[in-house]
Every structure is written in structure tokens, then in C-alpha cells.
Amino acid sequence: MRTFTAVVEKCPDTGLYVGYIPGFAGAHSQGETLDELRRNLNEVVTMLLEDGEPTLESEFAGLQTITVP
């Protein structure tokens, strides 16, 4: 079993949740709910892994909060 970190945002125009796996080309999806997005991302990643072991272009390192004056 493999674990990947997804970045998730909510589109203000459509109201959809949009997610992607940083550094994993093609690993992105959307859904009306967070559960739907999770299922969709799982399906996409499973399909991509079936096509062969991915070469990750980068690795998730974390999040930073930036405060500006």
C-alpha cells in the first residue's frame, strides 16, 4: 500500500473541490464533496500506478503560513 499527500482547494467559481498530488504528473481530479474527491483521486492514482511506477517530479515537503503587513 502506498500513501500520497494531496493538495486540495475549493474553486470559488464552481464550488468543486480540486485536488492533485504534488510531483505526480496526471494525478489530479475534482469532486462535489471531499469524499467524492478522495474517491476520484484514489481511482486516478490507482490507474496511473497500474501503468507503471511513477517517477515523482518532486516530493511534498509541507505547508507554510505567510503573514504580510
Summary of predicted features, one role per range:
Residues 1-7, 35-69:
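Short, charged, surface-exposed hinge/linker loops at domain edges
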Residues 9-24:
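Short aromatic-glycine-(Arg/Gly/Cys) micro-motifs in beta-strand/loop hairpins
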Residues 25-34:
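A short, exposed loop/beta-hairpin motif centered on an aromatic-Gly-Thr core
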